[in-house]
Amino acid sequence: FVGSRGLGDVYKRQHLDIMDGHFVPNLSFGPQTVSDLRKSSSLFFDVHLMLQQPDRYIDPFIEAGADLISIHLEPEYDHSRALAKISAAGIQNGIVINPDTPAHSLLPYLEQVDLILFMTVNPGFGGQKFIYEVLSKAKEIDEIRKKENLNFLIEVDGGVNPEHVKSCLNAGVDILVAGTAYYKLDKLGRKHFADLFENAYLKDFL
């Protein structure tokens, strides 16, 4: 389930978490699965690389059909070069920070990125509690975005449920990703979740 504010039909998104069992303890899937999904889907593929060496896997996910690739700031590699490589392929790039990573670490990349993703849980497993303190970082970056007239989007991922929608909007968040909370709901509960997004001017859900 992905809600995005004011982005129109083009931004019906599928958020895909790629985990390597090293940077995060869990293991998911690779570019072949993304390629297989692409054959039967026209959704916007928002590919989140939770990898120790994400720069080594950019090309395979570009070839698999990603529309956006986001990479974590925490591992050591040339972040700016990796972001430029993604952009050079004609797709969108993003940079991600974990809950404990300070917002100011994003400053060198604000003019280079299409998206900033704030993890609102420690990445790797679903079902964790939303960390509200992260929203102060999102707000800080949103204020810089407005002051400098920058165009990147702000996304949050992790522990998102209906009670967080208003707080996220107030922090300047454009895109919310909800997994465990949404899929645990019955049909009526999912409709209620979607209605909350609609009433808060968030549109286009998956």
Question: What residue ranges belong to the model's regions?
Answer:
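Single conserved hydrophobic/aromatic residue that forms the stacking wall/gate
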Residues: F1-Y11
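Glycine-rich, proline-tolerant flexible connector loops at the mouths of alpha/beta enzymes
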Residues: H15-P31, V121-G127
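Conserved, mostly hydrophobic/aromatic
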Residues: D17, F61, I116, I141, ...
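Catalytic cores of alpha/beta
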Residues: D55-E63, T101-Q112, V160-L176
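Conserved anion-binding
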Residues: R56-Y57, D67-L153
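Glycine-rich phosphate-binding active-site loops on the catalytic face of alpha/beta enzymes
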Residues: I71-Y77, T120-Q128, A171-H192
